[in-house]
């Protein structure tokens, strides 16, 4: 299947499940977010990108601390749900876009989150390279990798290949179906 066909299928799937997404996946997503945030602080001047933001579950954890939170997703249905959550915050903005081709300048964000994104992308290396491009110097990148899709060695190798400083990859939590990698762009 070509790259765009895979992305289109993913987009259509999430458009269909958007209204029930939180009911189906919120507990699992929140466990990933909470694991990541135990490792990374969010200073008041933070500029955060939540790439593949889904329904915006991350917003409730970071928006009250950050200067700006940008939620990006390819699914209009998920963004409609995220919009409801974003209304509670004056600093959350949403963008309908492909995570491989974000509309942001180089080096903008202090924190880039990619929770449950890579397993949905046809070329995870390309996606990560784009996330690194928009991350500022010394920015944190928090990336999850579904264990059914990626081995720990593959994920760590990919992060290191792209010259990220891997601080930690959380693997041992039985509640998580994924690895949670905390990295810094150097």
Predicted features and spans:
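Conserved class I S-adenosyl-L-methionine
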Residues: 1-42, 57, 149, 177-180
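Class I SAM-dependent methyltransferase SAM/SAH-binding core
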Residues: 49, 55-101
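A short acidic, Gly/Pro-enriched loop at the edge of an enzyme's catalytic core
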Residues: 100-112
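A short SAM/SAH-binding and catalytic strip from SAM-dependent methyltransferases
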Residues: 111-123
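A short glycine-rich, Lys/Arg-flanked "PGG" loop and its adjoining helix->strand segment in the class I
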Residues: 125-137
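Conserved beta-strand signature within the Rossmann-like core of class I S-adenosyl-L-methionine
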Residues: 138-146
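Short alpha-helix
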Residues: 149-162, 179
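Core SAM-dependent methyltransferase catalytic element
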Residues: 171-186
């Amino acid at each position: 299947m070509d790259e765009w066909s895979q992305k289109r299928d993913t987009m259509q799937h999430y458009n269909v499940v958007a209204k029930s997404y939180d009911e189906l996946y919120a507990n699992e997503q929140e466990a990933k977010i909470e694991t990541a945030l135990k490792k990374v602080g969010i200073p008041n001047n933070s500029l955060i990108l939540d790439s593949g933001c889904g329904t915006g579950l991350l917003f409730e954890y970071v928006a009250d601390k950050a200067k700006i939170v940008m939620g990006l997703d390819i699914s209009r249905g998920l963004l409609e749900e995220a919009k409801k959550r974003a209304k509670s915050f004056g600093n959350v903005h949403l963008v309908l876009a492909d995570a491989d081709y974000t509309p942001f300048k180089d080096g903008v964000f202090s924190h880039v989150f990619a929770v449950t994104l890579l397993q949905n992308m046809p070329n995870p290396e390309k996606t990560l390279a784009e996330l690194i491009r928009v991350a500022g110097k010394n920015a944190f990148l928090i990336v999850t990798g579904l264990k059914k899709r990626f081995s720990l060695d593959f994920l760590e190798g990919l992060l290191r290949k792209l010259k990220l400083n891997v601080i930690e990859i959380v693997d041992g939590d039985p509640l998580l179906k994924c690895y949670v990698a905390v990295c810094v762009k150097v």
